[in-house]
């Protein structure tokens, strides 16, 4: 929805000289990469990959699905780099952003955390660390209050076998290559969390 150029262009994206994959890619350096990859040293091919995922609009409809979608997005963002150990070689960090102490929000947070735990365990992925910001409410003197949608920001980290094999969204003229469309909507074309759903509701 908003251009990310300011955020990516105002900083040095190659600090340390070990950045193998940064935010931008392609001839005109658009911020399209789904994950970041950093080399472990200056000569080897191993590294560390990280990505994020969040789904605040989905969380408004269902805190459970918001958690699951956040994890799913973070994982699909890091899937195109060769992680040591595959899926089980990825660790997650969960940053819970929630307007607690408002009616029903503590219960929604509990359901969201439980869903994240169940989903991660089913995938055999650990969540060894977390952070929380549980006072996401702004109160005014006239009695009005505004609070943020409860959401979890998921970060992934995993060791990369070969930093040279990370796939980026740059279409390259490689002979005998194909573009593959993967339909993740087998459960139906749900519109929850979409711009249309926000307008209708």
Task: Please give the residue ranges for each predicted region.
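Glycine/proline-enriched, intrinsically flexible loops and inter-domain linkers
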Residues: 1-201
């Amino acid at each position: 929805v908003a251009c990310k150029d300011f955020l990516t262009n105002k900083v040095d994206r190659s600090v340390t000289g070990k950045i193998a994959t940064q935010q931008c890619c392609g001839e005109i350096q658009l911020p399209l990469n789904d994950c970041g990859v950093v080399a472990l040293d200056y000569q080897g091919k191993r590294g560390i990959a990280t990505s994020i995922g969040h789904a605040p609009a989905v969380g408004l409809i269902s805190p459970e699905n918001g958690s699951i979608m956040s994890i799913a997005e973070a994982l699909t963002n890091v899937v195109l780099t060769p992680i040591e150990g595959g899926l089980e070689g990825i660790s997650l960090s969960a940053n819970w952003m929630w307007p607690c102490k408002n009616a029903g929000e503590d219960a929604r947070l509990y359901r969201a955390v439980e869903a994240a735990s169940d989903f991660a365990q089913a995938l055999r992925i650990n969540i060894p660390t977390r952070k929380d910001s549980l006072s996401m409410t702004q109160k005014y003197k006239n009695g009005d209050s505004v609070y943020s949608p409860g959401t979890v920001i998921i970060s992934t980290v995993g060791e990369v076998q070969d930093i040279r094999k990370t796939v980026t969204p740059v279409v390259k003229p490689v002979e005998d290559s194909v573009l593959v469309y993967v339909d993740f909507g087998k459960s139906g074309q749900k519109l929850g969390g979409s711009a249309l759903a926000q307008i209708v509701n």
